[in-house]
Amino acid sequence: MRIPDVEADEAFFSLPRREQARRIRQRENALVAAFRDAVQGSDAERCWRAVQALQFQGLWRRAVRSIMGMNPSDVFRRHCLESWVIWGDSLRNEIGEDLFLIELLGVLMPKYEGGAILLYRGDSFFNRCRRTYGLSWTSSRKVARSFADGIFCRTSKGGSCLLETYAPHDAVICAPGLLNNNYGKDEFIVDRRRLKRVDILERFPEETFEEHRRRVEAVAKL
């Protein structure tokens, strides 16, 4: 299916506004349909092209809703996992809403087959207070602590903390760290809504960027 590119059509801006709006809707519908059809057909290459086309279009909510209830092949899910390892952070920033991302990954990623598991996360104290934990947790306390003590968490309002939870099976969407641990993060993707209890193991005070830089430099000299 060819997706019309209204921006590439020089005559587009000379059209009446109603016709411009119609063509924009046509393109948006085509972008969402291309993504939906790729997932439905378990076509990893087409899915990746569709994901790239959806960037900066503000259509992710529609795209996610369009694939709810689908069950693509295991091979397709594995391809999506390999892509997630590379572009997961940018996709999260693009979607901008963790709960929609959770629904998306529940369809695209390999299903978690294990049981309940002890997990850790380094997060801002702000997120802890609001229970708005991120998706990525780890089975490694050391890895989680390094994130808690990192620049992004330490410079957030209120500082940061090292979290621990015993995640039930249904809270774990996928375990990338068990399938592809090239980055050594031992990562688990978790639906925070299904966590029963989350404890704080350590608190780290808030730092300015300059304070953090000086502290890291001092530690490196030891």
Annotated model-derived regions:
Residues M1-I117, F125-L135, R141-L222:
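Conserved NAD+-utilizing ADP-ribose enzyme module
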